[in-house]
Amino acid sequence: LMAFGAMDAFVAAGAGQPGRTVWFSSVNTSLQALQSLRSGQLAALAGGHFIAGAWALVMLYDYHHGRDFASEGLELERPMFTLFTPAMARRYQQRFGQGFDRLDVRPYSKVLNPTVQRYQFGFAQLL
């Protein structure tokens, strides 16, 4: 986690305090990163790119059950990152703090939800 190494070096050099005299950002959804955003040590935090695997599995599930995703094109562009606010970080920790066993992607499946016409994948809506 480069941002935390940079923060440590900045503090060790006596150059100031993260979140007060200098701003750091990170791309990470570790507990440390989420807490650092909530405490103000990180000025910006992005994450959520790992959820692309879940979206791919939804599409493969649908394909396996006879619903081809080619109608949306073979190259899908979906937002991979979400810019977290402190409130989003808190919700993320509450919902997924102990793991992703509570993540339910069934509402995104076209097979399980025949009224779904286009995939509406996005990390922010999971919060």
Task: List PLM regions with ranges.
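Hydrophobic alpha-helical segments within soluble ligand-binding/sensing domains
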Residues: 28-33, 49-65
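Sec/Tat-exported extracytoplasmic proteins
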Residues: 6-14, 41, 64-68
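Short, hydrophobic secondary-structure boundary micro-motifs
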Residues: 19, 45-46, 71-73
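Charged/polar, solvent-exposed surface patches and flexible loops
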Residues: 8, 35, 39, 62, ...
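Hinge/cleft segment of the Venus flytrap/periplasmic-binding protein
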Residues: 56-127
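Glycine-rich beta-alpha junction loops
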Residues: 1-2, 28-31, 50, 80-88
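Short beta-strand elements at the ligand-binding edges of bilobed clamshell
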Residues: 39-49
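Hydrophobic alpha-helical
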Residues: 1-35, 57
